[in-house]
From Swiss-Prot:
Domain of life: Bacteria
Role noted for this protein: Transaldolase is important for the balance of metabolites in the pentose-phosphate pathway.
Gene (name only): tal
Annotated keywords: Cytoplasm, Pentose shunt, Schiff base, Transferase
GO molecular function, one term: transaldolase activity
Organism, scientific name: Syntrophomonas wolfei subsp. wolfei (strain DSM 2245B / Goettingen)
Protein name: Probable transaldolase
Length: 213
């Protein structure tokens, strides 16, 4: 399972990219708004930092405007993937962008039906939001498992991105289920690195070394 960071913060992306495992970045309008920077300029900057897919979401909600905005964002860098919200207009836009050779990421996916439709429309990726499904009292990991099983059953080429990751165990479960990718917030990645026994072991090694020398 590949690891993406879900962030639009340049310093966060630089830090995590420096660890050597980062394979891509996902952004959304909320994350971009926090940075208070020019949208296209920010996507361009991220694209120069990370050698992998960079998801940039359209703001428009009608098909023609989505396609136009998607083409503009895709022109920033070859690695830019256009995030399209799952709706009727979005499915039309996904199909149109596919015909133009532009990669898409169907976002705000909350059912296996939605994921299947997006894949058949031509989405390069689908992003089920497991944490938000959990928030409704349902099981987001069951949704992820359903999508992975259906795609495996029919050899669907669309890749699955486990999104709305809330804690490290979401990552472990996503990997066990067989998700192609997990896109993970900065703070959760930091939690994944840490373990109290690792910290205690490092502290003991350093203490023993100082005593010996």
């Amino acid at each position: 399972m590949r690891i993406f960071i879900d962030s639009a913060n340049i310093e966060e992306i630089k830090e995590i990219n420096g660890m050597g495992f980062l394979a891509g970045v996902t952004t959304n309008p909320s994350l971009v708004a926090k940075e208070k920077k020019d949208y296209k300029g920010l996507i361009r900057e991220i694209s120069m930092l990370v050698d992998g897919p960079i998801s940039a979401e359209v703001i428009a909600l009608d098909y023609q405007a989505m396609v136009q905005e998607g083409e503009e964002l895709a022109s920033i860098h070859p690695n830019v993937v256009i995030k399209i919200p799952l709706c009727e207009e979005g499915l039309k836009a996904i199909h149109a962008l596919k015909q133009k050779g532009i990669a898409t990421n169907a976002t705000l996916v909350f059912s296996a039906n939605q994921a299947l439709l997006a894949a058949r429309a031509g989405a390069s990726y689908v992003s089920p939001f497991i944490g938000r499904v959990d928030d409704t009292g349902n099981d987001g990991l069951t949704l992820l498992d359903d999508i992975v099983q259906i795609f495996d059953q029919y050899m669907v080429e669309t890749e699955v991105i486990a999104a709305s990751i809330r804690h490290p165990m979401h990552v472990v479960a996503s990997a066990k289920i067989g998700s192609n990718i997990a896109t993970i917030p900065y703070q959760v990645i930091k939690q994944m690195v840490k373990h109290p026994l690792s910290d205690a072991g490092i502290e003991k090694f350093m203490s023993d070394w100082k005593k010996a020398f």
